[in-house]
Amino acid sequence: MSNTQITSQAEKLALIRESERMTRKQVAELTGINYNTYAGYEQGKVKMSFDAGMKFFKPERFRKYRDWFMFDETYPAGGQIAPALAHIGQDSTTLHHSDQKTG
């Protein structure tokens, strides 16, 4: 299992939706969560309840993100991944300076 580090629930919801190339309206329709309620979750105005989380992860399309969303963990062999747009591991990458001249 690998760890990932996205902190806010709102940011995670947006990354999942954007990685699936969906609109907020499409997510609301797929999950059965009221559009305005879902938009509030994604905008960070209110935290998603456990019941809403169950609705969100019920569609098979979103199940692959469940461990990442809840525990900041992925397990690709078990089908648990992070969204493509999450840019996992960026802050742990070090760029080394090169003394080579270009041009």
Map each language-model feature to its residues.
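Short, charged recognition helix plus adjacent turn
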Residues: S2, D67-G103
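Conserved hydrophobic/aromatic packing and binding residues within compact polymer-binding modules
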Residues: L13, V27, Y38-Y41
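The alpha-helix within a helix-turn-helix
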Residues: R17, A28, F57
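Short, charged amphipathic recognition helices of the HTH superfamily
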Residues: M22-K25, S49-F50
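A short, basic/aromatic helix-end/turn motif that makes direct DNA contacts
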Residues: L30-I33, P59-R61
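Recognition helix of helix-turn-helix/homeodomain-like DNA-binding domains
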Residues: G32-M48, A52
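DNA major-groove recognition helix of helix-turn-helix/homeodomain DNA-binding modules
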Residues: F50-W68
